[in-house]
């Protein structure tokens, strides 16, 4: 790791200060004199460096220095947003607290000082040193800044001890470089969004809690410091159940020269809540009126999937338009199709439901979806629509059904030439929509739909909401002329803007930026490949078979895996000819080659191997019997933002055909 010159000199200065504080130089001089007296033979002229190092180590000086310096590479667990602004998350080290701080800006220092009453983990035994255990991770977002705590073992009283430095600023013109005062900060209504994630021993993540912290109480506290007890509630069906308590300390830096009275702060917060409640009430009145008018067009509209409100992870009803917003990926994603691939490799998991019955509704806020790294079809569709809007496309989320009448959400883009394109967010596939004419002559050739969608009830984005009022809600017969009010009933854009525009209400969750991947693709690819080799060898050993690996054949599989991912990202196939030519050269006459590629969105080698064995063709390769059998396996991990990844694996074998 290379440091810029100014950082290197700063680090040297800190180390020098610490060494001076410990009087290390004086102790070294004492030990040097003592060593010369005791160990230098009369015929020796000088001590070697190695002799001195041994003496220092023997007397514990080196250990003392290392303990005092206490390098904390792991404690600075931070993620960089796609915007240039760097966020800082750090531990309790006082030296770190004083670095990387711009003295001309205002900061809020948020410390998490442990947790308690996580009763689900009351009986959890304390993990042994080195033992893999389930962990909690706290993720934060505040005004385009993302933070992540160190993972701590799950316990009734989890040992959270992290600090996060949040910059508080106004984006308005002229205020960018001015330090925010108390009055300015009181007008910044953005909450701190905190998401608690549990990761089990297999790497599976669970959303435990999602909490919006109102931080402005610190503006009315003495010395600009306050301690809070935050009760975290569960998600989904458990949104009324407490899952645990966090102890939080808030501190303004630099300290406020003038604090506000608590009465002023409380009045401002109450006024904001009142305004938000009134806007939401007026929108609800309007939505009810719109729905009545929609049903008057045709009574059968009552059975269509027209989704105006949806519950988030905390069980709060929000207008669906608030789940979508133009989202720019910075330099993390280059094209709309690459964005579709990124959304596709995020895991798919339906919201958990206790007991039987229908599907549990849970449209996650974007931070909860990204931190958990998986979600339902609506979460994927909302994110993909937001990214496509960021690329300047006219994109909408479609709500309807697919085969067997299962509710589903997907994305639609409208081209300037009238082309309607469906994007399936769970697979990355795209389909051109060509409507069939139900009144056409029986023998007339009609376009055959390739997409899996059956009906469509409504479409929406951050500015528009339209209900399908055509005679049939079948997708194949739908005309997507969204300006034709006889086919699509629109909601008032002003009404939507009043509750869904950025900053319109204080209850609107802000959209976080995407974070770059923290996964090293080469290292991870190699690790999974080594694990798979071991699993294959053990499996064949159980069958009484020997295993001979051919590294060159494994290497030749790389272009194929790269080609498969390129095709998924661009819909263009390339490089297959060179791969086939190389394989023909590598397989001698009279030998047979077999290959089996497979794709995963997780990095668990054992789980992937078990899945591969369920394929008869793959099992045939792994359990290959014959003369001169040579096996090969190649793994290629392709990383995407938010540490999402596409994992391509190819098993192959070549053997001499014996007839």
UniProtKB/Swiss-Prot annotation:
What is the superkingdom listed in this entry's lineage?
Eukaryota
Locations listed in the record:
Cytoplasm, Cytoskeleton, Microtubule organizing center, Centrosome; Cytoplasm, Cytoskeleton, Microtubule organizing center, Centrosome, Centriole
Which of UniProt's keywords are assigned here?
A: Cytoplasm, Cytoskeleton, Phosphoprotein
Q: Which Pfam family is an annotated match for this chain, by its short name?
A: CEP76-C2
Q: Does the keyword Cytoplasm apply?
A: yes
SUPFAM superfamilies per the UniProt record, alphabetical: Cysteine proteinases (SSF54001)
Q: Which GO terms describe its cellular component?
A: centriole; centrosome; cytoplasm; protein-containing complex
List residues, modification Phosphoserine.
Answer: 75, 83
BP-aspect Gene Ontology terms: regulation of centriole replication
Xref: InterPro entries: CEP76 (IPR052299), CEP76-C2 (IPR028926), CEP76_C (IPR056288), CEP76_N (IPR056289), CEPT76/DRC7_peptidase-like_dom (IPR056290), Papain-like_cys_pep_sf (IPR038765)
Q: Please indicate if the UniProt record lists Transcription regulation as a keyword.
A: no
Cysteines joined through disulfide linkages: none
Transmembrane residues, as ranges? none
Protein's job: Centrosomal protein involved in regulation of centriole duplication. Required to limit centriole duplication to once per cell cycle by preventing centriole reduplication.
Q: Which family does it belong to?
A: Belongs to the CEP76 family.
Q: Describe, as the record does, how this protein assembles with itself and its partners.
A: Interacts with CCP110 and CEP97.
Against PANTHER family, the record matches this protein to: CENTROSOMAL PROTEIN OF 76 KDA
Q: What is this protein called?
A: Centrosomal protein of 76 kDa
Q: What organism is listed for this UniProt entry?
A: Mus musculus (Mouse)
């Amino acid at each position: 790791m290379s440091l810029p010159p100014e950082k290197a000199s700063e680090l040297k200065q800190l180390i020098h200060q610490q060494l001076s504080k410990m009087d290390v130089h004086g102790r070294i001089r004492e030990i040097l004199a003592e060593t010369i007296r005791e160990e230098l033979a009369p015929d020796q002229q000088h001590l070697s460096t190695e002799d001195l190092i041994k003496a220092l180590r023997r007397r514990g000086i080196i250990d003392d220095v290392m303990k005092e310096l206490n390098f904390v590479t792991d404690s600075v667990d931070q993620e960089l947003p796609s915007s240039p602004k760097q966020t800082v998350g750090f531990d309790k080290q006082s030296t770190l607290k004083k670095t990387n701080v711009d003295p001309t800006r205002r900061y809020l220092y948020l410390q998490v000082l442990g947790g308690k009453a996580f009763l689900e983990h009351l009986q959890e035994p304390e993990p042994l040193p080195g033992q893999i255990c389930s962990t909690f991770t706290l993720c934060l977002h505040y005004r385009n800044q993302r933070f992540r705590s160190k993972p701590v073992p799950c316990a009734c009283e989890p040992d959270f001890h992290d600090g996060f430095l949040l910059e508080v600023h106004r984006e308005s013109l002229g205020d960018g470089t001015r330090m925010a005062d108390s009055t300015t900060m009181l007008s910044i209504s953005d909450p701190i969004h905190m998401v608690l994630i549990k990761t089990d021993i297999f790497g599976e993540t669970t959303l435990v809690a999602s909490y919006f912290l109102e931080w402005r109480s610190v503006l009315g506290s003495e010395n600009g410091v306050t301690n809070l007890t935050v009760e975290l509630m569960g998600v989904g069906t458990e949104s009324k159940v407490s899952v645990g308590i966090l102890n939080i300390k808030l501190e303004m830096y630099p300290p406020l020269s003038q604090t506000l009275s608590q009465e002023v702060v409380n009045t401002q917060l109450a006024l904001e809540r009142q305004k938000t409640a009134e806007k939401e009430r007026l929108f609800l009145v309007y939505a009810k009126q719109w729905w009545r008018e929609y049903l008057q067009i045709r009574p059968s509209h009552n059975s269509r999937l027209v989704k105006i409100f949806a519950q988030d992870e905390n069980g709060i009803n929000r207008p669906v338009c608030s789940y979508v917003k133009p989202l720019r990926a910075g330099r993390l994603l280059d094209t709309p199709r690459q964005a579709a691939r990124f959304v596709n490799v995020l895991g798919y998991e339906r919201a958990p439901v206790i007991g039987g019955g229908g599907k549990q509704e849970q449209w996650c806020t974007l931070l909860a979806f990204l931190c958990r790294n998986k979600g339902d079809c609506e979460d994927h569709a909302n994110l993909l629509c937001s990214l496509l809007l960021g690329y300047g496309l006219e994109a909408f989320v479609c709500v309807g059904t697919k085969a067997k009448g299962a509710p589903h959400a997907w994305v639609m883009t409208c081209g300037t030439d009238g082309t309607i394109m469906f994007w399936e967010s769970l697979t990355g596939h795209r389909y051109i929509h060509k409507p069939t004419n139900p009144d056409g002559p029986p023998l007339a050739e009609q376009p055959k739909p390739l997409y899996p969608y059956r009906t469509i009830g409504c479409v929406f984005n951050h500015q528009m909401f339209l209900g399908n009022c055509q005679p049939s809600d079948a997708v194949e017969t739908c005309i997507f002329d969204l300006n034709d009010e006889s086919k699509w009933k629109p909601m008032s854009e002003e009404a939507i803007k009043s509750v869904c525009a950025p900053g319109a209400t204080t209850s609107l969750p802000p959209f976080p930026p995407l974070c770059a991947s923290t996964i090293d693709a080469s290292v991870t690819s190699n690790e999974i490949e080594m694990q798979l080799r071991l699993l294959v060898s053990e499996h064949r050993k159980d069958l009484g078979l020997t295993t001979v690996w051919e590294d060159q054949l494994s290497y030749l599989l790389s272009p194929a895996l790269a080609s498969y991912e390129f095709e998924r990202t661009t819909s263009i196939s390339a490089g297959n000819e060179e791969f086939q030519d190389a394989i023909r050269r590598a397989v001698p006459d009279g030998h047979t080659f077999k290959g089996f590629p497979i794709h995963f969105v997780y990095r668990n080698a054992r789980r992937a191997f078990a899945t591969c064995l369920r394929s008869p063709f793959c099992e045939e390769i792994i359990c290959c019997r014959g003369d001169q059998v040579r096996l090969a396996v190649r793994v290629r991990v392709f990383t995407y933002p938010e540490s999402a990844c596409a994992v391509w694996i190819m098993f192959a074998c070549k053997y001499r055909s014996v007839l």
